[in-house]
Protein backbone atom coordinates (compact mmCIF):
# COMPACT_ATOMS: atom_id res chain seq x y z
CA UNK A 1 0.00 0.00 0.00
CA UNK A 2 1.78 3.18 -1.20
CA UNK A 3 0.39 5.35 1.62
CA UNK A 4 3.57 4.77 3.63
CA UNK A 5 5.60 6.41 0.86
CA UNK A 6 4.20 9.82 1.75
CA UNK A 7 7.52 11.61 1.37
CA UNK A 8 9.08 9.41 -1.29
CA UNK A 9 9.24 9.94 -5.07
CA UNK A 10 7.02 7.90 -7.36
CA UNK A 11 8.14 4.35 -7.97
CA UNK A 12 8.80 4.87 -11.66
CA UNK A 13 10.84 8.01 -10.96
CA UNK A 14 8.54 10.23 -13.04
CA UNK A 15 7.53 13.70 -11.99
CA UNK A 16 4.07 13.37 -10.45
CA UNK A 17 3.11 17.04 -10.51
CA UNK A 18 1.49 16.86 -13.96
CA UNK A 19 -0.52 13.79 -13.04
CA UNK A 20 -1.60 15.46 -9.79
CA UNK A 21 -2.95 18.45 -11.71
CA UNK A 22 -4.75 16.16 -14.13
CA UNK A 23 -6.29 14.15 -11.32
CA UNK A 24 -7.77 17.31 -9.81
CA UNK A 25 -9.43 18.18 -13.13
CA UNK A 26 -11.04 14.81 -13.91
CA UNK A 27 -13.79 13.23 -11.77
CA UNK A 28 -12.53 10.68 -9.28
CA UNK A 29 -14.32 7.52 -8.28
CA UNK A 30 -16.52 8.26 -5.30
CA UNK A 31 -15.69 6.59 -1.99
CA UNK A 32 -17.99 3.70 -1.14
CA UNK A 33 -18.83 3.42 2.55
CA UNK A 34 -17.92 -0.02 3.87
CA UNK A 35 -20.79 -2.03 5.29
CA UNK A 36 -19.03 -3.62 8.26
CA UNK A 37 -16.87 -0.76 9.61
CA UNK A 38 -17.27 3.01 9.97
CA UNK A 39 -14.24 3.81 7.80
CA UNK A 40 -11.79 1.90 5.68
CA UNK A 41 -8.93 3.84 7.26
CA UNK A 42 -8.35 6.14 10.23
CA UNK A 43 -5.35 8.45 10.47
CA UNK A 44 -4.40 9.74 13.91
CA UNK A 45 -3.01 13.27 13.70
CA UNK A 46 -3.48 16.19 11.28
CA UNK A 47 0.14 17.30 11.13
CA UNK A 48 2.55 17.08 8.21
CA UNK A 49 2.57 13.25 8.21
CA UNK A 50 -1.18 12.83 8.64
CA UNK A 51 -2.01 15.18 5.78
CA UNK A 52 0.59 13.47 3.60
CA UNK A 53 -0.83 10.02 4.37
CA UNK A 54 -4.34 11.21 3.52
CA UNK A 55 -3.18 12.57 0.17
CA UNK A 56 -1.66 9.25 -0.88
CA UNK A 57 -4.66 7.31 0.39
CA UNK A 58 -6.94 9.47 -1.79
CA UNK A 59 -4.61 9.25 -4.76
CA UNK A 60 -4.05 5.50 -4.84
CA UNK A 61 -7.30 4.32 -3.25
CA UNK A 62 -9.97 6.90 -4.19
CA UNK A 63 -12.86 4.55 -3.37
CA UNK A 64 -11.74 4.05 0.23
CA UNK A 65 -13.26 6.10 3.05
CA UNK A 66 -11.11 7.61 5.75
CA UNK A 67 -11.14 9.89 8.78
CA UNK A 68 -8.38 11.93 10.41
CA UNK A 69 -8.72 12.22 14.19
CA UNK A 70 -7.02 15.31 15.63
CA UNK A 71 -6.96 16.24 19.32
CA UNK A 72 -6.33 19.92 18.66
CA UNK A 73 -8.73 22.32 16.96
CA UNK A 74 -6.43 23.08 14.04
CA UNK A 75 -4.30 21.51 11.33
CA UNK A 76 -0.54 21.58 11.72
CA UNK A 77 0.52 19.30 14.56
CA UNK A 78 3.88 20.50 15.86
CA UNK A 79 3.59 23.71 13.87
CA UNK A 80 0.29 24.59 15.51
CA UNK A 81 1.45 23.68 19.02
CA UNK A 82 4.87 25.34 19.22
CA UNK A 83 4.66 29.13 19.61
CA UNK A 84 8.02 30.03 21.14
CA UNK A 85 10.03 32.93 19.64
CA UNK A 86 12.03 31.98 16.57
CA UNK A 87 10.24 28.68 15.90
CA UNK A 88 11.42 27.34 12.53
CA UNK A 89 12.24 24.09 10.75
CA UNK A 90 15.45 22.18 11.35
CA UNK A 91 15.40 20.77 7.80
CA UNK A 92 14.97 22.56 4.49
CA UNK A 93 11.39 22.53 3.23
CA UNK A 94 12.40 21.35 -0.24
CA UNK A 95 13.27 18.06 1.46
CA UNK A 96 10.86 18.18 4.40
CA UNK A 97 7.85 19.23 2.31
CA UNK A 98 5.54 17.23 0.07
CA UNK A 99 6.83 15.98 -3.28
CA UNK A 100 3.32 16.36 -4.72
CA UNK A 101 3.17 20.02 -3.60
CA UNK A 102 6.72 21.41 -3.65
CA UNK A 103 7.64 24.16 -1.23
CA UNK A 104 7.74 27.55 -2.98
CA UNK A 105 8.41 29.78 0.01
CA UNK A 106 11.16 32.37 -0.03
CA UNK A 107 13.19 30.64 2.69
CA UNK A 108 14.19 26.99 2.58
CA UNK A 109 14.54 26.97 6.39
CA UNK A 110 11.07 28.29 7.09
CA UNK A 111 9.45 29.79 10.17
CA UNK A 112 6.73 27.94 12.04
CA UNK A 113 3.71 30.01 10.90
CA UNK A 114 4.74 29.59 7.24
CA UNK A 115 5.00 25.81 7.62
CA UNK A 116 1.61 25.66 9.33
CA UNK A 117 0.07 27.70 6.49
CA UNK A 118 1.68 25.36 3.94
CA UNK A 119 0.16 22.27 5.59
CA UNK A 120 -3.25 23.97 5.86
CA UNK A 121 -3.15 25.01 2.20
CA UNK A 122 -2.30 21.46 1.17
CA UNK A 123 -5.22 20.06 3.16
CA UNK A 124 -7.65 22.55 1.61
CA UNK A 125 -6.35 22.11 -1.94
CA UNK A 126 -6.91 18.36 -1.91
CA UNK A 127 -10.10 18.37 0.16
CA UNK A 128 -8.40 16.60 3.04
CA UNK A 129 -9.69 19.15 5.55
CA UNK A 130 -13.21 17.79 4.98
CA UNK A 131 -12.15 14.45 6.49
CA UNK A 132 -10.84 15.74 9.84
CA UNK A 133 -12.59 15.33 13.18
CA UNK A 134 -11.06 18.03 15.37
CA UNK A 135 -11.06 18.16 19.15
CA UNK A 136 -10.98 14.38 19.62
CA UNK A 137 -8.15 12.27 21.00
CA UNK A 138 -7.67 8.52 20.76
CA UNK A 139 -7.68 6.85 24.18
CA UNK A 140 -7.32 3.25 23.01
CA UNK A 141 -7.07 1.16 19.85
CA UNK A 142 -8.12 -2.49 19.97
CA UNK A 143 -7.44 -4.95 17.15
CA UNK A 144 -9.68 -7.97 16.52
CA UNK A 145 -8.17 -10.82 14.52
CA UNK A 146 -11.60 -12.44 14.28
CA UNK A 147 -13.15 -9.50 12.42
CA UNK A 148 -9.88 -7.94 11.14
CA UNK A 149 -10.98 -4.55 12.41
CA UNK A 150 -9.71 -1.81 14.70
CA UNK A 151 -11.99 -0.33 17.34
CA UNK A 152 -10.90 3.12 18.50
CA UNK A 153 -12.09 4.73 21.71
CA UNK A 154 -12.28 8.50 21.27
CA UNK A 155 -12.71 11.30 23.78
CA UNK A 156 -13.99 14.75 22.88
CA UNK A 157 -11.53 17.16 24.45
CA UNK A 158 -14.11 19.87 25.19
CA UNK A 159 -16.37 17.83 27.47
CA UNK A 160 -14.87 14.35 27.86
CA UNK A 161 -17.66 12.61 25.95
CA UNK A 162 -16.51 9.22 24.68
CA UNK A 163 -17.39 7.34 21.51
CA UNK A 164 -16.14 4.46 19.38
CA UNK A 165 -15.37 4.09 15.69
CA UNK A 166 -14.17 1.10 13.69
CA UNK A 167 -11.85 0.78 10.71
CA UNK A 168 -9.82 -1.73 8.72
CA UNK A 169 -6.55 0.17 8.59
CA UNK A 170 -4.95 2.44 11.21
CA UNK A 171 -2.16 4.94 10.56
CA UNK A 172 -0.41 6.64 13.48
CA UNK A 173 0.84 10.13 12.58
CA UNK A 174 1.24 11.44 16.11
CA UNK A 175 4.93 12.35 16.17
CA UNK A 176 7.53 10.87 18.45
CA UNK A 177 7.09 12.67 21.79
CA UNK A 178 4.36 13.63 24.23
CA UNK A 179 2.70 16.91 23.34
CA UNK A 180 0.89 17.28 26.66
CA UNK A 181 3.80 16.20 28.87
CA UNK A 182 7.12 17.60 27.63
CA UNK A 183 10.30 16.30 29.21
CA UNK A 184 11.37 18.48 32.12
CA UNK A 185 14.50 17.48 34.07
CA UNK A 186 14.62 17.79 37.84
CA UNK A 187 16.56 20.77 39.16
CA UNK A 188 17.44 20.87 42.84
CA UNK A 189 16.13 24.03 44.45
CA UNK A 190 13.71 24.80 41.65
CA UNK A 191 10.96 25.61 44.15
CA UNK A 192 13.11 28.45 45.56
CA UNK A 193 13.43 30.22 42.21
CA UNK A 194 11.27 33.35 42.28
CA UNK A 195 11.28 34.02 38.56
CA UNK A 196 9.23 32.48 35.76
CA UNK A 197 10.04 29.00 34.47
CA UNK A 198 8.73 28.20 30.99
CA UNK A 199 9.00 25.10 28.83
CA UNK A 200 9.13 26.10 25.14
CA UNK A 201 6.61 23.41 24.27
CA UNK A 202 3.98 25.36 26.24
CA UNK A 203 5.07 28.95 25.62
CA UNK A 204 2.48 31.44 26.96
CA UNK A 205 1.14 33.62 24.16
CA UNK A 206 0.98 36.67 26.43
CA UNK A 207 4.45 36.30 27.97
CA UNK A 208 6.43 39.55 27.72
CA UNK A 209 10.16 39.07 28.21
CA UNK A 210 11.06 42.71 27.52
CA UNK A 211 13.86 43.86 29.81
CA UNK A 212 14.18 40.47 31.50
CA UNK A 213 17.36 38.53 32.17
CA UNK A 214 16.88 35.12 30.59
CA UNK A 215 18.70 31.81 31.00
CA UNK A 216 18.08 29.13 28.37
CA UNK A 217 19.03 25.63 29.58
CA UNK A 218 20.25 23.42 26.75
CA UNK A 219 21.83 23.95 23.35
CA UNK A 220 19.74 21.81 21.04
CA UNK A 221 17.66 22.83 18.04
CA UNK A 222 15.05 24.66 20.13
CA UNK A 223 17.65 26.69 22.03
CA UNK A 224 19.52 27.60 18.85
CA UNK A 225 16.40 29.21 17.40
CA UNK A 226 15.08 30.62 20.68
CA UNK A 227 18.16 32.51 21.90
CA UNK A 228 18.71 34.81 18.87
CA UNK A 229 14.99 35.57 18.68
CA UNK A 230 14.85 36.74 22.31
CA UNK A 231 17.77 39.14 22.10
CA UNK A 232 15.59 41.79 20.48
CA UNK A 233 13.73 42.63 23.70
CA UNK A 234 15.36 40.79 26.59
CA UNK A 235 17.95 42.67 28.63
CA UNK A 236 20.32 39.71 28.69
CA UNK A 237 20.17 36.13 27.33
CA UNK A 238 22.51 33.33 28.43
CA UNK A 239 22.60 29.76 27.14
CA UNK A 240 23.76 27.02 29.51
CA UNK A 241 25.25 23.85 28.04
CA UNK A 242 26.20 20.82 30.07
Please report, for each region that a protein language model flagged, where it lies by residue.
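Residues in well-ordered beta-strands of folded domains
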Residues: 99, 153, 199
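Glycine-rich active-site loop/strand segments that organize a redox cofactor
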Residues: 76-121, 242
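Short, solvent-exposed coil/turn elements at secondary-structure transition points
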Residues: 72, 101, 138, 144, ...
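Rossmann-like dinucleotide-binding core of oxidoreductases
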Residues: 31-38, 42-43, 48, 52-55, ...
Amino acid sequence: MPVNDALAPSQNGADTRASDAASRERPLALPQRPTDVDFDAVIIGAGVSGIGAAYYLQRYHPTKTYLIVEAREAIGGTWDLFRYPGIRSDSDLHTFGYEFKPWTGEKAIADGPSIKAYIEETAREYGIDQHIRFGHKVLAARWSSDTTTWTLELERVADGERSEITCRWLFGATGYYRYDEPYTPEFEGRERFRGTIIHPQHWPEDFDYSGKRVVVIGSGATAITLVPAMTDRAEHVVMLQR
